[in-house]
């Protein structure tokens, strides 16, 4: 199977995209190209196939994001979504739009593979079977271990989640650069005689862009207030980047000579393997709904610039329960500001960074070669006696950045109006301008003697290789309201909540905190906006179905202070429900048949979850495990922490140290010790668990570390550790993060 080009979109939805409440449906057997793809997979039992044509039926809707995450992350299944079986273009576009609405990001492709990547969803769109590697659908080893243990691993949280409602995902841009694309003439002087060769080895583009979809609410005084806008942030920062752009592991050369006798002419030539004349990255929005708000770098950067910079952006946020004592009864409004930072480490070496903003929608960053930019400048000698035969190029003048695993850093923030609707396509082009290096020796003959001079050739070919990635943002997505969804529970029933169906009709159904159909945003105007469709609102004039949102007072609601009564601003009456049927209505008072009590609580369709900071370092491979029913952490430790896991057969890390376990019940605080390890590198060397009753248990050792640093995490009251994220290599554990219920 050849190495294939693909654009993989990795979504780790910290605030989940909204989707249908229907449970995972039984989908037909695959056919056509989908069957060909699955037939190449060794274990097809790990694959869940969805024919999007079946989703056109009203009773067979898309799985919700929570259900999809459970299937892919917890059960470690591979999902293949097939749009190719929809025969008409209009129907296909409609289902692709439904997909975008359900999961927060959309693609105009025939197929989408959905897999797990670093504990999150990875979306890989493609159009033909030969564009995808069947290995992508193979179940990983961890899936077999988790299946045997019965453990699941719910979606992870992010430190931004507790403060900032947002959807975040990764775009993995992968493109192999073929030998043909990097093939040039062996000789510039004797093109037709010396043949050609690939000037690259294992060349590829492999970058991971981080994307955030979020809302900033206006907060603060005029002149320094946070923007009131919908935000799309695209970053290549220190926490993403990928493997980089690679042309060669090292630079080699070949020597060629003239095939005829020369007197006063070029007689010898060297061709050196390819380097990058420039690297270019272009960001573009497809329409004027989105405009560039901020970029980093903000200006051009000279060569030999080496510094770690922070790109910060301040947003206005609701602040959550900590700021408002009203909790889920609080209207959506900015009560705090939050600075979202990205660290960008620069070491430009031979290159100058040139920023070019063509208009409000497009900006490009070009790493343009400035130091030793010509073949002539790479020469380490100018003349020699004629009998000297030596390679005249000093390849040490070419930094590895020019050909091996170049990783750029940049940050682009787009804004849209707070009232913007519709959608925008965002396109990212990542490219490298490949050039071979040609140098020649010229024989100078002057009867009584001769010598040679060295030269570089600049009128030589360049070849730009580009990989494009795109994603579509739906401006009507509920994350752009900036609020946390809530439900409305009918208090005369033990377990009934207001639920909306696909036609907007309202009914009472069993409460489910993960259903978007039972979730609403209580907005600035006091309207209850459906999280399933942000264009529909609860209207006191028509309580059998949601109505298009407008400025009518019948759509505005207030909570009567000190009660569980939700009153309509226009009529002054309270929302009530029939105690037998759950039918909604407005009433001045309750009676034997009608209750006015309505309970509201936050729903977790946005999957907000609290986590500890990362204790230690985010080096090595990240592994995510759910804590088992015994609530224990299993450890192998000695001079440092060798391995961690939620079970003795799920340990990740090295094989050293002795095995023990830690009781995670009743933990009050966790202190991590890290620093310069006596046996090499910066390591996490010890974890100390302090319990509610004052007991302490330490795993690892502090005896073999210098320049020690301690980080302490205090667990909130009644919080339980439910999940682990562990960073490790084959020797030691590097870092750990604890997720709470």
UniProtKB/Swiss-Prot annotation:
Keyword Membrane found: yes
Annotated signal sequence range: 1-25
InterPro entries membership: Hemolysin_beta-prism_lec, Hemolysin_N, Hemolysin_N_sf, Hemolysin_pre-stem_dom_sf, Jacalin-like_lectin_dom_sf, Leukocidin/Hemolysin_toxin, Leukocidin/porin_MspA_sf, Ricin_B-like_lectins
Topology class, membrane: Multi-pass membrane protein
Presence of keyword Transmembrane: yes
Site, Susceptible to proteolytic cleavage: residue positions: 144-145, 148-149
Region named Beta-prism domain: 607-741
Cysteine pairs bridged by disulfides in the record: 182-200, 497-511, 537-549
Main location, first listed in the record: secreted
Official protein name in the record: Hemolysin
Organism: Vibrio cholerae serotype O1 (strain ATCC 39315 / El Tor Inaba N16961)
Gene that encodes the chain: hlyA
């Amino acid at each position: 199977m050849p190495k294939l080009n693909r654009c993989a979109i990795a979504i780790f939805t910290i605030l989940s995209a909204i989707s249908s409440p229907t449970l995972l449906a039984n989908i037909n057997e695959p056919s056509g190209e989908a069957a060909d793809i699955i037939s190449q997979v060794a274990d097809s039992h790990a694959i869940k196939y969805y024919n999007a044509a079946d989703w056109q039926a009203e009773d067979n809707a898309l799985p919700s994001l929570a259900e999809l995450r459970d299937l892919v992350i917890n059960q470690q299944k591979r999902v293949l979504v097939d749009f190719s079986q929809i025969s008409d273009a209009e129907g296909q576009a409609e289902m692709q739009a439904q997909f975008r609405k359900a999961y927060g990001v959309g693609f105009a492709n025939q197929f989408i593979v959905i897999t797990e990547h670093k504990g999150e969803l990875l979306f890989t769109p493609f159009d033909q079977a030969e564009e995808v590697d069947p290995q992508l659908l193979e179940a990983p080893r961890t899936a077999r271990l988790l299946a045997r243990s019965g453990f699941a691993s719910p979606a992870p949280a992010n430190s931004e989640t507790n403060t900032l409602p947002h959807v975040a995902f990764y775009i993995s841009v992968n493109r192999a650069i073929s030998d043909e694309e990097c093939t040039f003439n062996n000789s510039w002087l004797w093109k037709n005689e010396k043949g050609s060769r690939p000037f690259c080895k294992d060349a590829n583009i492999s970058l991971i862009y981080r994307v955030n979809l979020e809302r900033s609410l206006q907060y603060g005084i005029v002149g320094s207030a946070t923007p009131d806008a919908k935000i799309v942030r695209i970053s290549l920062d220190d926490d993403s980047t990928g493997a980089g752009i690679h042309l060669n592991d090292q630079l080699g050369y070949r020597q060629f000579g003239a095939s005829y006798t020369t007197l006063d002419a070029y007689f010898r030539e060297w061709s050196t393997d390819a380097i990058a004349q420039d690297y270019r990255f272009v960001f573009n929005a497809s329409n004027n709904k989105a405009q560039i708000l901020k970029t980093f770098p903000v200006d051009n950067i000279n060569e030999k610039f080496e510094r770690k910079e922070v790109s910060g952006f301040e947003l206005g946020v609701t602040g959550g329960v900590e700021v408002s004592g009203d909790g889920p009864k609080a209207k959506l409004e900015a009560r705090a500001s939050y600075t979202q930072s990205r660290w960008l480490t620069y070491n430009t070496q031979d290159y100058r960074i040139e920023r070019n903003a063509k208009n409000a929608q497009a900006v490009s960053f070009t790493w343009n070669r400035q130091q030793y930019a010509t073949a002539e400048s790479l020469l380490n000698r100018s003349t020699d006696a004629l009998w000297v035969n030596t390679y005249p190029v000093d390849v040490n003048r070419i930094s590895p950045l020019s050909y091996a695993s170049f990783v750029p850093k940049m940050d682009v923030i787009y804004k849209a109006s707070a009232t913007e609707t519709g959608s925008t396509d965002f396109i990212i082009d990542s490219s490298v301008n490949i050039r071979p290096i040609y140098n020649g020796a010229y024989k100078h003959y002057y009867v009584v003697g001769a010598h040679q001079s060295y030269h570089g050739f600049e009128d030589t070919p360049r070849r730009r290789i580009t990989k494009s990635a795109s994603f579509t943002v739906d401006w009507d997505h509920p994350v752009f309201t900036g609020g946390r969804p809530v439900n409305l529970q009918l208090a005369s029933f033990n377990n009934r909540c207001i639920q909306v169906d696909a036609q907007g009709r309202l009914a009472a159904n069993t409460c489910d905190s993960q259903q978007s159909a039972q979730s609403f945003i209580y907005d600035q105007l006091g309207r209850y906006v459906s999280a399933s469709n942000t264009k529909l609102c609860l209207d006191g004039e028509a309580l059998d179905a949601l109505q298009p949102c407008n400025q009518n007072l019948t759509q505005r609601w207030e909570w009567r202070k000190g009660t569980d009564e939700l009153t309509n601003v226009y009529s002054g009456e309270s929302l009530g429900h029939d105690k037998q049927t759950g039918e909604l209505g407005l009433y001045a008072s309750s009676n034997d048949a009608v209750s006015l009590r309505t309970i509201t609580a936050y729903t977790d369709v946005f999957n907000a979850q609290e986590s500890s900071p990362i204790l230690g370092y985010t080096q090595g491979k990240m592994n995510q495990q759910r804590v088992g029913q015994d609530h224990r952490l299993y450890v192998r430790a000695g001079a440092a922490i060798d391995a961690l896991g939620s079970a003795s057969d799920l340990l990740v890390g090295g094989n050293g140290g002795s095995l023990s376990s830690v009781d995670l019940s009743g933990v009050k605080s966790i202190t991590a010790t890290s620093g310069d390890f006596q046996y090499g590198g910066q390591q996490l060397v010890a974890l100390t668990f302090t319990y509610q009753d004052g007991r302490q248990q330490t795993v690892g050792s502090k005896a073999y570390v210098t320049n020690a640093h301690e980080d302490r995490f205090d667990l909130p009251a009644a919080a339980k550790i439910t999940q682990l994220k562990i960073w490790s290599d084959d020797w030691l554990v590097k870092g750990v993060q604890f997720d709470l219920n």
